[in-house]
């Protein structure tokens, strides 16, 4: 797999996790050998448990690497309660004065059934208040979960080999993360009482 923006290739796996924005619990996981995330959005949605998708509308926020119009369109057709919010290009961190005071539409735009997912359609989703609200949660939801797994739990490399074994080990790591997170949520709930 190509490592970062360098010319180096390393033999490694790409770990995927779907994290709930409200609880920060990991609700779906799987490893892959694909070097980038371009073809992963459908698999990621399918890794989310059916109980989560059945009970409410699911918004999936993903960074630029996941954007593939055809795959997003296919995913949304197969999973009608799922709406993908995905950046189409890298955007700088700073905002201009015009961008700060720009009036954005409040809700996601209406889309006709059967219409192809294009870069422009995804940009239109992101240029709404709801789209920006959902997308802004991405970096404060998924990144902390991976940070806790790596820094707090000390998980940096796999002990097993092979995609199936890596999947089992990754599931074990995310289960232990979820148990720790549920304990924290329980403590917070008791403190509020």
List each language-model region with its residue ranges.
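Anion-binding and metal-coordination hotspots
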Residues: 1-193
